[in-house]
């Protein structure tokens, strides 16, 4: 299965690296030349062309900052038709994603930083028009990255706040316990 990871930052790299390790054929997109070299150095196939990556993919991960989602989806809209798009962009609603890519199969997710070691809690909300088969394919892929849990999208913003902060709070508690003896 071919998977495009649009955005080669920390989260995009973690998604790409872990899926590649699991045997998926990955292409990552990144605009910054120094970051492209870093991603290539760790063995990932990289391009700066989002449309090319989307065209070659069966599934597309959107791993860009929320402010960049609109531009990316407008750019790849035609190449993403009838494909599963998994967005990890915080605070970007399913309705917004569906409006930008109406012919794609959208899943909104929120992983946490434990994604780096494939141990993330991953909340996900599929678009209501997704088939059970599409959801199962996405869950299989998300399972490589951690533990996926389907939630109602109305809870996603709260989960985003908790999921993003929980590892930091646990690290703070662990550090305090270490100093306390």
Residue positions per predicted region:
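A structural micro-motif
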Residues: 1, 24, 44, 83-84, ...
